């Protein structure tokens, strides 16, 4: 029997391995599009000319009259300006199954009177029409930088800060757009300016060169449509981490932005590990968490198998990235979010609402996180030499800290119905106390009402009890059973009282039951 159970435990990970394993056979290349990339030739030496070309690339990347592949090519041209050898940069990082980059040089000819003396050429020929298309008159639909709205002079910035700093400010902002462009496009503009603030404060990005909101949205739309551009940027981060130690200031700033890009779209997966598993609370022994734990183990194996590109599986749209969504391990995720909103106040703003939210596990996570016994790690007691007296004092302090806040946090955001659990403490007392409290529950503690929710109705919790100051140790299965018992009793009491209450106050409690059922908490 033990061998059979171990087979089931490892099935999830072995299944993922078999799905992702190559089936052999011939590799048939797919269709690739051709993208033009422009690089500076050796004759372009003036810093003012270089900055002008950089802003020209940026303007073309925002031109909605051009195809997205062309706009993506201009962003690649802009990113390549950070390197002394753009050709080597593209050869190292730009190998892609979707596109083939064709490189054109931009040279400066003092004898030319048109297009500011610039000419687009290759080793064999010059491209007059392409030059006019690239450097001809353009009508910007909106300013590129916020400084253009107050008539800031780029030449003054160039003389004050130098070309590398000005170019770096532009390129760093393109990288910041990538942080939210793929995984959270709705919050792109807000997320961009939040991340930018640190670079504003340290002087990396000058106020006159800050992108406008329209520029941010335009770059984000190109990134979402041009996966080859995103792949190039990810490969840039990978090669920075593995190949070089002599990074320029711009490259170091790109690495800082890369820390925000890593694991983008994997917050649910990482938070489930952090708050659900690494806290090592006894609730992990529950049988209904076992399948999700096995699933999480399989996902960890999949993540590690991706090597240095693992943190980018979401923005790279790796076929396996959907497996990391919390809907694939809902019970464990719900439990972890319950622990998180208690242990980390910032997590109370995290979106925990969703159709896959298991309300009972969400409440259980909060209950065990509030329990002083669960907060003490037995694994560290011997290592740290903690005495029994010290543990008792610690329990006392923890009880005092949490005693004033008995409220349960409700799920936020998503599609969840707001369910306010006002001081609805789950009793962690012994079985005898639980039975005694259940019998005298309604008359002793009265009725508490949650705040109003949409539709003008209320979700009520009748006679929710307070925790006793001193809590005895008990098995987690007892906790789970007690939660189920409380919910069942509240359903029975509500069903018995709904008829009279409806006649007395005219409230439609049938809709309350429907709302509560949708929220996953029965007939509270």
From Swiss-Prot:
The keyword ATP-binding appears for this protein: no
GO MF annotation list: molecular adaptor activity; RNA binding; structural molecule activity
Region Homomultimerization, residue ranges: 440-461
Region of interest (Ncore), ranges: 1-404
Region (Interaction with the phosphoprotein): 462-471
InterPro entries, per database record: Paramyx_ncap
Signal peptide region: none
Biased composition (Basic and acidic residues): 487-508
Variant or mutagenesis effect after changing residue 324 to I: Unstable form with complete loss of homomultimerization and replication
Region (Disordered): 487-524
Keyword Oxidoreductase carried by entry: no
Biological process (GO), any one: negative stranded viral RNA transcription
Stretches for region Ntail: 405-524
Keywords for the protein's UniProt record, in alphabetical order: Capsid protein, Helical capsid protein, Host cytoplasm, Ribonucleoprotein, RNA-binding, Viral nucleoprotein, Virion
Assembly and binders: Homomultimer; forms the nucleocapsid. Binds to the viral genomic RNA. N0 interacts with the phosphoprotein (via N-terminus); this interaction allows P to chaperon N0 to avoid N polymerization before encapsidation. Interacts as N-RNA template with the phosphoprotein (via C-terminus); this interaction positions the polymerase on the template.
Domain comment quoted from the record: Ncore is globular and carries regions required for self-assembly and RNA-binding. Ntail is an intrinsically disordered monomeric domain in the C-terminus.
Miscellaneous field: Most abundant protein in the virion. There are 2564 molecules per encapsidated genome.
Role of this protein: Forms the helical nucleocapsid (NC) in a ratio of 1 N per 6 ribonucleotides, protecting the genome from nucleases. The encapsidated genomic RNA serves as template for transcription and replication; encapsidation by N is coupled to RNA synthesis. Forms the encapsidation complex with the phosphoprotein protein P. Before encapsidation, the newly synthesized free N protein, so-called N0, is chaperoned by P.
Family the UniProt entry places it in: Belongs to the paramyxoviruses nucleocapsid family.
Protein's name in the database: Nucleoprotein
